[in-house]
Amino acid sequence: MKKTTISYSILTHNETDSLLKLIEFLVKHKDEEDEIVILDDYSDNPKTKEILDVMCSMHNITFDQRHLLKDYAGQKNTLTRMCKNDYIVNIDADEIPHKSLMKNLKPILESNPTIDLYWVPRVNTVDGITQEHINKWGWNVN
């Protein structure tokens, strides 16, 4: 039986520390047959460029650049076409999947082969958040 494979897809633009943490996490927790795919909106932050150059070459990450030009759907569609595996997990550059998700994702996918789409709830954790931030960004805390 063929192994289930996953493409972890990430859109980026000038992310730095969070992107590095995400890549390091995925490299550590993904299976060997899985891939990391990054589409960058021509980041102009030198630190972001360095992270992408180093991490993509060190870890055989599929990487390309495309101008967003207010076309988020086109950006996501381009990223999707870059992915080669059975399933795609879209991750924001400032998110880290839970370790239990990484461990249990393939068994869940393999035991439900007729399901094409999964919704994964997430918990946002923001260091140093204040009520002012919550009000400014229109977040709900519940």
Question: What is each residue range found by the language model?
Answer:
Residues M1-K28:
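N-proximal low-complexity "stem/linker" segments adjacent to membrane-targeting elements
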Residues I23-Q65:
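Acidic donor-binding segment of Leloir-type glycosyltransferases
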Residues F25-H29, V54, T78, M82, ...:
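A generic secondary-structure signal
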Residues Q65-Y72:
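Short, acidic/glycine-rich phosphate-metal binding loop used to engage nucleotide
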Residues A73-T80, H98-N142:
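Catalytic-site signature of metal-activated, phosphate-bearing donor transferases
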Residues I88:
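Short aromatic/hydrophobic "clamp" motif used to bind/position activated sugar donors
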Residues D92-I96:
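The conserved acidic donor/metal-binding loop of glycosyltransferases
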